[in-house]
Design a protein with these regions (language model features):
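Non-catalytic accessory regions
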Residues: 1-131
Length: 131
């Protein structure tokens, strides 16, 4: 039962971050039941998310939010496998040139959805206010 609860929470979390759509989660839940697979494995098998992204949200996300340290948007997006080292370097260069925010550039390049940036920034800011 606990595994089912964790899987539902994973699906909700990924939807909240706008990493998967309602339709994708419905298909994944059907496939999960039909094939007895874990939700994250189904999402990876469909090619909707990377294994690194699933692992980040299963093992690291709650830890990051619970720790007293500050984590940057850049760090979280990289750890979640949503941006590559090369993309991060290009964003940093553009930041120096344009003085725009990291998230703004990532969205403008269409590497990350604006709602995903909002999700991370909101969670990170909320955690900092709570500490």
């Amino acid at each position: 039962m606990n595994n089912v609860i964790n899987q539902k929470l994973l699906g909700v979390l990924l939807q909240d971050a706008h990493l998967i759509s309602d339709v994708q989660i419905q298909i994944a839940l059907i496939d999960q039941q039909a094939y007895g697979m874990r939700l994250g494995d189904v999402l990876v098998l469909h090619g909707w998310l990377k294994q690194q992204t699933i692992d980040f949200f299963i093992t690291r996300w709650n830890q990051l939010l619970a720790q007293g340290r500050e984590y940057s948007l850049e760090y979280c997006l990289q750890e979640a496998g949503l941006l590559s080292d090369q993309q991060i370097e290009l964003i940093r260069q553009e930041q120096i040139r344009s003085k725009r925010s990291f998230g703004n550039i990532a969205v403008q390049q269409r590497w990350v959805k604006p709602q995903t940036i909002d999700f991370f920034e909101s969670a990170l800011n909320h955690r900092q206010l709570a500490s």
